[in-house]
Amino acid sequence: MSWFSGLLVPKVDERKTAWGERNGQKRPRQATRARGFCAPRYMSCLKNVEPPSPTPAARTRCPWQDEAFIRRAGPGRGVKLGLRSVALGFDDTEVTTPMGTAEVAPDTSPRSGPSCWHRLAQVFQSKQFRSAKLERLYQRYFFQMNQSSLTLLMAVLVLLMAVLLTFHAAPALPQPAYVALLTCASVLFVVLMVVCNRHSFRQDSMWVVSYVVLGILAAVQVGGALAANPRSPSAGLWCPVFFVYITYTLLPIRMRAAVLSGLGLSTLHLILAWHLNNGDPFLWKQLGANVVLFLCTNAIGVCTHYPAEVSQRQAFQETRGYIQARLHLQHENRQQERLLLSVLPQHVAMEMKEDINTKKEDMMFHKIYIQKHDNVSILFADIEGFTSLASQCTAQELVMTLNELFARFDKLAAENHCLRIKILGDCYYCVSGLPEARADHAHCCVEMGVDMIEAISLVREVTGVNVNMRVGIHSGRVHCGVLGLRKWQFDVWSNDVTLANHMEAGGRAGRIHITRATLQYLNGDYEVEPGRGGERNGYLKEQCIETFLILGASQKRKEEKAMLVKLQRTRANSMEGLMPRWVPDRAFSRTKDSKAFRQMGIDDSSKENRGAQDALNPEDEVDEFLGRAIDARSIDQLRKDHVRRFLLTFQREDLEKKYSRKVDPRFGAYVACALLVFCFICFIQFLVFPHSALILGIYAGIFLLLLVTVLICAVCSCGSFFPNALQRLSRSIVRSRVHSTAVGVFSVLLVFISAIANMFTCSHTPLRTCAARMLNLTPSDVTACHLRQINYSLGLEAPLCEGTAPTCSFPEYFVGSVLLSLLASSVFLHISSIGKLVMTFVLGFIYLLLLLLGPPATIFDNYDLLLSVHGLASSNETFDGLDCPAVGRVALKYMTPVILLVFALALYLHAQQVESTARLDFLWKLQATGEKEEMEELQAYNRRLLHNILPKDVAAHFLARERRNDELYYQSCECVAVMFASIANFSEFYVELEANNEGVECLRLLNEIIADFDEIISEERFRQLEKIKTIGSTYMAASGLNASTYDQVGRSHITALADYAMRLMEQMKHINEHSFNNFQMKIGLNMGPVVAGVIGARKPQYDIWGNTVNVSSRMDSTGVPDRIQVTTDLYQVLAAKGYQLECRGVVKVKGKGEMTTYFLNGGPSS
């Protein structure tokens, strides 16, 4: 994954940090099942070995996700990857998987006759994707392979033209017209080969070249039929068979074009044979055999072309899925970055990322992510009158108002070079001067304060509620970073931060309250007046802090600001249209006067921006990326890097082992095709040759063997209808590459035996010997004219000599049958090219031994002699035995080795192409699988990371369905228990000395305390609790925030929080014992309704608001060290559950007057 760019791309196995293990366990990865592409079946039971089960697409989206990629696709806008025929669709069975690939759902309904014919018709039709753009990408995807295949085909055809020219010109005086035709064809093929090799060769040109080749082949076929001497319906039959075969396998054309071309070439030969041999008495027999031969060749072509094309399209779908997974992973990375950087500054996030990616040894303490920064200014701002505003708003309006207001503050902070630290209810604080130091940090904070007061004045004007801002600023040093293991939030700590907080508390509404330290950094650029903060805040009075209130900027500062605004406006105008506009997280569309808020930069034009973003189609993005990847990749380089050149085996043994375990789900269909070829061969043999009981027995035995093999292979798919032993046998064959290859070779061998078996039952007596006896001549002196004199003619089945064996007059059909048996091996796409080459040479060698040296050799010699007799009879001329003309053709038994070599070359080239494609597809699929697994792991990690920032139910809300960017999360909770737990004397413990690294060691101990609290809240018994945040040394948690944790009847979520509070007290005692400290905790508990929500859809921060939260905080601040103070409402619930409580009495609470409170002393006595 090193090639991915992203902030966090960790290996999941290395995420062994404490927070990761406690914040959600990784879901066990489900075993991935190889999903075969279900093609229309050749037989009803020949389904995929393991039919894919459709999985509903699960879409997830967070509000901070990339809008262009996760946008909801409108009707008709999404691109489905389902295959379809040009005329017929697969809509009834297609299922779109989450990765975007279309699969065919298993069809368990009974198949009717029309349904089977419908599926059979689909096999013969061209496949294409519904999207024309996707179809073009697919053609580009395999263009390099097709270009290479077409180039090799041109070379083969040049060789074939040379062979035909040799066969025609060697034995007799050639015909000039046919020689010229073959020469022109050779030249054209050479020219086309050069054209195909050019870099400028384009996809559209490939179709033109393919159809030009078909035209040339038709012309050669016509010329060969006219030039044949002597003429016969079977003369040169192997040539059109070869043309038909390469049309399906080596020409890059669609199925429909291949079927039409194959049938056209076949029909052309049949018409020529019928027209040129109309007077032959045996014409019907040979034409019938030719029809069967061509039908078988076309069937082999279809059985080869269909699965090859489907496999290629499936490979394209998987590769596109890989591209989509990669892009999705990149988007996930960006979303993760956006989410993390919304909570943590980049310098902190990068350090945490490095630690997450690196395995760490066990350490005594958790690592602390703290950095020290000097010369910074801290701004605290609080909304005065927020309680009145909240009381007049619904939950949605409150969250919306805070979201809009703080989003505006975030924009102002960015403009004024301030870093937002945290939002605490209605309090907002930021720092200028970190992570990068700035000399004008005090000016930035003052300008930020001025802008915030202006912004709140607009809220006051629109809502009619008297709200205002108190702003306090102090300059000094801070420690910034993250504490704890859960609910990370970036924060700052130091004495100067504490002082800045009190500056806000002691400030005045609508004014900016600063210290002398900040005033010194302002260099007199602002007019000030005494602030008298000590009169309003005890801490300021105790520390004798001199404070000031900003009156306004000096004249010099006003001039500088005016010049700066002018420069910024000029720069903005020059960059208009190049930079994206700021889009708020939500417009004030539901407030009283949205026009006023346009002055804040929030207007309806943001909707147009969102619409422009939504217009970006993620499918188009994937297709565009795929197009660039197709243009950039090099198939030759992939082969060179991963595959051995001749053997086509992987260079890495582990890849070869994985590939050897690859299962072809269409293996049963391959065996069924072999059975079909066998049946065609039987028809040819029965039509042309005499047959005996022995041959019928052999054919019946072969048929039964092949049929049983087909049925055994089908058992694996047909399920529980068969015995377990038979099912195990079927699985052992189909799911093992070695076993299925052995069965495939065995099937081809049976077909080959059926092609040559009849040769041994024919008469093997030489005709020359018989004629020599009758004419009292030596066999070498016998010519065709002598045979004509004694009425020996072609086509007689009766024995010509003594004996009972019948005569086989047309051995060319033995050659044709053997060629069909060899072509049947091309159907088994899973057999390696070397395996097919060896098998072809072995079978061809056996056949040639029989042909040249065995008894069947006389059959071919007799045929050549009788064919010459037939030629003499056709010429109607009379010759005597002395001046008999020589035969004008090469003997069939000498032509056969060359024919076999040509077919073997074509078979090997096709096998190489299929295996090379399959192996490269396997590489891509392996990458796709790895990327999908990594994506799943990263998604699980993202989910844990998300849960570490937002509560699980909130995260689930955003992940449940796709949402618009302006939708907010808000929830009114009727009965929530809230806890504030603070270390009362931590401020006394915290000192900034050189001995403790300016206070860092104090924060290290605080980090350990918070980490202990996080570990406790992660325990199963406290699953109803949710950590909200930490505020300095105060820990905030709540329970009952969602339906799964809210117990309306038993109120168990309330007792769980009480138990947790007591558990924290015990843990603090344990910490004091081991750290030799005397920390004192004060804990306040309250219950009641709250409003929960996420502030800032782009920079999310979960929080809860309401009177319940404020009172709970007061229970903490007015509490007693080492005691847990609760309200009357909580007392009533806990007392009913048997908890031990005591009445403290009446306590004065700020904003609430006097309240009766209680101390929680222990749990139920039982």
Swiss-Prot record:
The keyword Nucleotide-binding applies. The chain crosses the membrane at residues 150-166, 179-195, 212-228, 237-253, 257-273, 287-303, 672-689, 700-716, 741-757, 818-834, 837-853, 895-911. Its cofactor is Mg(2+); Mn(2+). Binds 2 magnesium ions per subunit. Is also active with manganese (in vitro). It is found in: Cell membrane; Cell projection, Cilium; Cell projection, Stereocilium. Phosphorylation by RAF1 increases enzyme activity. Phosphorylation by PKA on Ser-660 inhibits the GNAS-mediated increase in catalytic activity. Phosphorylation by PKC on Ser-554, Ser-660 and Thr-917 inhibits catalytic activity. The keyword Manganese applies. One of its GO terms (cellular component) is plasma membrane. Activated by G(s) G alpha protein GNAS. Inhibited by G(i) G alpha protein GNAI1. Is further activated by the complex formed by GNB1 and GNG2. Activated by forskolin. Inhibited by calcium ions, already at micromolar concentrations. Inhibited by adenosine, AMP and their analogs. Phosphorylation by RAF1 results in its activation. It is an enzyme of class 4 (lyase). ATP binds at residues 382-387, 424-426, 470, 1029, 1103-1105, 1110-1114, 1150. Its EC number is 4.6.1.1. GO terms for biological process: adenylate cyclase-activating dopamine receptor signaling pathway; adenylate cyclase-activating G protein-coupled receptor signaling pathway; adenylate cyclase-activating serotonin receptor signaling pathway; blood vessel diameter maintenance; cAMP biosynthetic process; cellular response to catecholamine stimulus; cellular response to forskolin; cellular response to prostaglandin E stimulus. Changing residue 311 to A: No effect on phosphorylation by PKC. GO terms for molecular function: adenylate cyclase activity; ATP binding; calcium- and calmodulin-responsive adenylate cyclase activity; metal ion binding; protein kinase binding; protein kinase C binding; scaffold protein binding; signaling receptor binding. Residues 1-149, 304-671, 912-1166 are cytoplasmic. Keywords: ATP-binding, cAMP biosynthesis, Cell membrane, Cell projection, Cilium, Glycoprotein, Lyase, Magnesium, Manganese, Membrane, Metal-binding, Nucleotide-binding, Phosphoprotein, Repeat, Transmembrane, Transmembrane helix. It comes from the Eukaryota. It catalyses: ATP = 3',5'-cyclic AMP + diphosphate. Gene3D superfamilies: Nucleotide cyclase (3.30.70.1230). The protein contains two modules with six transmembrane helices each; both are required for catalytic activity. Isolated N-terminal or C-terminal guanylate cyclase domains have no catalytic activity, but when they are brought together, enzyme activity is restored. The active site is at the interface of the two domains. Both contribute substrate-binding residues, but the catalytic metal ions are bound exclusively via the N-terminal guanylate cyclase domain. Part of a complex containing AKAP5, ADCY5, PDE4C and PKD2. Interacts with RAF1. Interacts (via cytoplasmic N-terminus) with GNAS, GNB1 and GNG2. Catalyzes the formation of the signaling molecule cAMP downstream of G protein-coupled receptors. Functions in signaling cascades downstream of beta-adrenergic receptors in the heart and in vascular smooth muscle cells. Functions in signaling cascades downstream of the vasopressin receptor in the kidney and has a role in renal water reabsorption. Functions in signaling cascades downstream of PTH1R and plays a role in regulating renal phosphate excretion. This is Adenylate cyclase type 6. It comes from Rattus norvegicus (Rat). The lineage of its organism: Eukaryota, Metazoa, Chordata, Craniata, Vertebrata.
